[in-house]
Amino acid sequence: MAFNNSTIIIIIVIAFAFFLIYSQNNQPKIIQQPVPQISQFKSQLNQPQNSQHNGHLNPSIISPQLCPKCDKENCSLEQISPSRSKSPTPQITNVHIEHESDPYSDPIKKQDIYGMMDPLTFPQQRLPREVLQKYQEYYDKNGSYPPFGQNTQPLFDNPVLAGILIKQVDENEPFTDNVPSSIPLFKVKSNKNSNRFFYYIIDQRYFSKLELKIPLDSIRVNGVRYNNAEFYGIPELFDGDVIDNIALYPSNRFSVKLYKIYSFP
């Protein structure tokens, strides 16, 4: 039996139509859910507030209760914090140090520095610290210093700048830079009823901050040496006197040039 072409085409079309109907029936159905609106979110947010006003609290938003001990500590902190905030911050305006080892409150050291830097303080050693402390203890008890260890004839006056020593230069002497051409001369009377004086000079070779004081104890005045000059002093010097054998300048000679004495009218 022979089929013509038209019959075959009709059969193919019918089979394709059945296939399309079958495929549409077997596809999954998609259900579209409605999108929530903003008004719905607002109503959900307002629900806890409305429940609080109505007296019905949501158990999920209830805060945990504190134990009695924690509650007391919180109350104490709340009471302390306002008082602390109201109290003013202390300000340090003055600092006063009182200690035996403080160098700025040591009167003995202050006196040592003063005697070292002051050119009008006679060069001499002070008493040991333990002796000076005994002096102070005696003064605190009796109101006066003890007589032991004091000179029976103390210095009558403080040292003064009496004049200068001018270096004598010989023609054959080589030039030296470490010997100054002039040196300040200081003197102080040994005691009130004496005609002897203590003399000293200041080392100015290097122009340092600390100028050393050199006592003139072993000098020769016009070729004459005086014994025990460190205890009793030497006779008063006058203009034109020649001094040599100074400990600082042993090979040099100096002539004395005194300042004029000011006379009151």
From Swiss-Prot:
Coiled coil: none annotated. The chain crosses the membrane at residues 1-21. It is found in: Host membrane; Virion. The lineage of its organism: Viruses, Varidnaviria, Bamfordvirae, Nucleocytoviricota, Megaviricetes. This is Uncharacterized protein L330. GO terms for cellular component: host cell membrane; membrane; virion component. Glycans are attached at N74, N142. It comes from the Viruses. It is a single-pass membrane protein. Keywords: Glycoprotein, Host membrane, Membrane, Transmembrane, Transmembrane helix, Virion. It comes from Acanthamoeba polyphaga mimivirus.
